[in-house]
Amino acid sequence: MSEATATPPPRNTLIPPSILMRGFTGSRLSWMVALSVLALLSIGWVAVVLTLDLKARDAVAAEVRQNTNLARVLQEQTVRVLASVDQATLRMRDAAVAGELTPADYGRIANETGLVPQILTQLSLVDAQGRFVGSNIDPTGEKTGHVDLSSREHVQVHLASDKVPDASQQMSPDGLFLGKPVLGKVSNKWTIQLSRKIERSDGRILGVVVASLNPAYFEQSYSEVNLGPKGGVTLLGNDRSVRARVIGGTPTGMGTTLSNNSTMARLPQNERAGWSIVTSNIDKIERVAAYHRVADYPLRVYVLTSTEGALSDWRSLRNVAVTLMGLLTVASLAGAGVFLRGLRQLE
């Protein structure tokens, strides 16, 4: 019998740890460590950038909500005043058409608004020829005299509209005209003239009711809203004439007419409310602008704040996040450098 062939012992296929580690030493392991650190740092920076971008968008969105709500609230406040004065002109007109208007009614109707004398400074009657008849402070017209007011825009728009064709844009749907602010030559005070035509059913014009409004009331109300040194509120007509304006808490620009390329003139004019981010042509400051039409009157309330102010808290967050991430980056790179230097020494 032949001897059986001896079966060789099974080979150990496991790689010894020393050989395995030897394969990862040197430049290969160095590259793996470096790439891992860079990948983690890149992910960290991307996360920081995306988070900061999201926070910036949230800050601007919050500013838009704030300005939009303020514009709505301020227009409601403006509407309450205008509606009370408007009702006074309607009552006075109806009494005149009915032939029941007496000098004593001027004061009674004006006082019923609750706005005399701080807001509604005068409620007047002008005849069909444009002459002053009387008012709540001069019922018979003896103090003032029956002066000719036919050349005034708020009277012409009703008695001779062809002479002031552009004034029609300041007429409300039911016939109330809201004029530009006028600076009194004697009183040196601004007033806004609201006027309504007195017309009989047969088309005969009997005159005009004129309500003189004190725009300082709106300036005072708007100045109570803290919008920062570069923020403000403006009450603007369709004719781009400023009825009231407060910038940085200070009244300014009463009676001025904005140019066609002004910040507010460049905003949509046909929408009832809205917002936009605009850059001023004058001071080059970017602002968040919100606006709201004042009911059916040819007026709008604009609320503007600087995006710089809106992002002040975000900038603080950005500085902290970038600083911390920068320190983490430096520490990670330094740690990786120490580790790689140790590997080279082991080689």
Residue ranges and their predicted role:
Residues 2-3, 10, 14-55, 322-336:
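Extreme N-terminal signal-anchor transmembrane helix of membrane signaling/transducer proteins, especially
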Residues 2-16, 250, 254-322:
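Extracellular/periplasmic juxtamembrane segments that couple receptor/chemosensory ectodomains to their
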Residues 21-23, 29-33, 39-102, 115-119:
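Juxtamembrane extracytoplasmic/periplasmic/luminal helical "stalk" adjacent to the first N-terminal
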Residues 79, 93-100, 110-118, 159-162, ...:
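Short regulatory alpha-helical segment in sensory/regulatory domains of signaling proteins that mediates
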Residues 114-120, 124, 129, 135-224, ...:
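Extracytoplasmic/periplasmic ligand-binding sensor regions of membrane-associated signaling proteins
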Residues 123-130, 232-239:
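Short hydrophobic alpha-helical segments used for membrane anchoring or interfacial signaling
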Residues 130-138, 240-247, 289-291:
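Amphipathic coiled-coil signal-relay and dimerization helices
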Residues 302, 308-347:
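Cytoplasm-proximal transmembrane signaling helix
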